[in-house]
Amino acid sequence: LLEWFKRPEEPVSKPLPKSVIVAALVLAPLVLAFIAYSRPWYFNQSYLGGFLVFELMTAAVWMYRRVFFVLVIVAFLFAGIELPVGSVWTAGRWAILGVGALVGSSIMLRDRKYRIGWFHVLALFAVLAALVSAAVSRYSGLSSLKVLSLLTLFIYAGTGARVSAAGRENRFFAGLLTGCEVFVGAVGAAYLAGIEVMGNPNSLGAVMGVVGAPILLWGVLVSEETFPRRRRMALFVLAVYLTFASHARAGMVAAFISCGLLCMVLRKYRMLINGVVVLAILVAGAAVLRPEQFSNTVAALTDTVIFKGKDPSEGLLGSRLSPWQAAVDSIHKHFWFGTGFGTSDNGQDATESLGKFATVVAASSEHGSSYLAILSWVGMVGVLPFVLLMLVLLWKVIETVVWMRRTGNPYHPAVPLAMVILAGILHASLEDWLFAPGYYLCVFYWSVAFIFVDYVPALATAESRSVLFWRSRAIQPRLGEVAPSR
C-alpha cells in the first residue's frame, strides 16, 4: 500500500489521441449532414439565427464590460430596422436584455460599490405604477409583458450599462463616439444607395437629432488632431443633413437646441457663427442661381415640414391635433388608472392574439407625445413617478449645463450625455417613444440616462478648466478619478 502511495501522480486530463481527433473531424460533417437530411427544420433561418444569437451572447457575457452594451444596442437596432436580419432579433433582443440585466445585477451585488439613489428608487416606483395600470387594463396580459420589458430595461440600465462605463470611461466614451461615426456613415451610405434602413422618416430624424448630431459635435470639440476633427465634422454635417432630409420637425428641434446650447455654454461662438454663415451662403446661392427651383423647394418644404401636408389654417401643429385629441379623450375615459402600460383601448377582443415580442396595431395607437402617452397608459394615479423621473433628469442636465458654462470644459463624461438627455426630452414631446422599451432609441436613451446620473455628482470636484477629464487619443486612467460616486 505504501508503494502505491509513492507512485507518481498521473495527470487529471490526458491529451486526446490523434486518432480520436481525426475521427471526430471526419465524422462531424457526416453527422451534421445526416441531421440536416433527417431533420431539416433544425437548419432553417430561425434555428440558425437563434444559434448565432446564443454564440454572440455567450461571447459577450465572457467580455461583459467591454462588449455587452454594444450587443444590446445592436440587437434592438437590428430588430427595428428594415433589413432581412430583423426577424431573428425580434425575440432574441429580449433574451439578450434579460441576460444583460441578470449578469449586471450579479456584478453589482458582488462588487457592492455602486451607488443607489433617488433616481433608481423612482425608476422602481415607475415600474410598480405601470404594473398597477396593467392589472386593470383591458389587455392585462399584453400590458404585463410590456411592464416586464420596462422592468428588464431599467434593471439592465441600472446595473449592466453602469458597469460597462464605470472605471473604464475613456474606452467607453471613445467607443461611443466611434460607434456614432460608424452608424451615421452607414446610414448615410444606405440612403445614398436608396435604402431607407431606418424604416420611416421619423425614426431617421429621431436617431440623428437625439444621438448622432450632439455626440458628433461633442466629438469635434474634444478632438485634438486635425484628421479626426475634420472626419467628425463631416459626419456631423451628414447627421444634420439626414435630420433635415427626414422632414421630422421633432428631430430638427432636438438637434438645433442641443447643438446650439452645447456651443453657447462652451463659448464656441465662432463655430456657431461659422455654421450659420455657411448655411446662409448656401441658401442665398441657391436662391440666386436657381430662383424658380428655390421657390418651389421652399414651398414644398413649407408644406411637408412645417404643416405636414395639413391645411395651413390649422396652425403649425395641425398634424398633431388629431393624435393629441385622441390621447386627451383616452385620458378622460380612463382618468385614474389609464388603459394599461403600453396599450390603448381600441375595442379589440382581449382574447385574441395581440403579439408577444413586438407591438401590434390592434392594441396601440399614436399619441403624438411621449408624455401624453404615459399619462394615457397609467392614468393620474400612476404618472407621478414618471414625472419625477423626468424632472430629476432635467435637473441633472441643468447642473451639467451650469458647470459647462462656468468652466468651459467639454472633457467630462457628463457633457455629451447631458446633450443627449436634453435632446431626448425635447424630441419626446412630439413623438411617443420615450417609454416604449422595445424601441432601440428608448433602450439607448435610458441606458445612457442611468450612466449620466452617476457622473453628475462628480462635477462638484471637477472645477478646474485646465484638467482634461477625457482624451480622444491615448487611453488614460485619469478619468477613473472622476468616476461615479460610489
Question: What would you call each of these model-derived segments?
Answer:
Residues 1-24, 222-229, 403-415, 428-434, ...:
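A juxtamembrane structural motif centered on a specific transmembrane helix
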Residues 30, 54-60, 127-134, 152-267, ...:
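Alpha-helical transmembrane segments of multi-pass inner-membrane proteins
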Residues 34-47, 84-92, 140-146, 196-206, ...:
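Helix-loop-helix junctions and helix-breaking kinks within/between transmembrane helices
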Residues 74, 80-86, 369-378, 409-453:
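Membrane helix-loop boundary segments at the extracytoplasmic
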Residues 241, 245-246, 263-311, 325-333, ...:
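A membrane-periplasm/extracellular boundary helix in multi-pass inner-membrane enzymes
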Residues 378-422:
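Hydrophobic transmembrane alpha-helices and their immediate junctions
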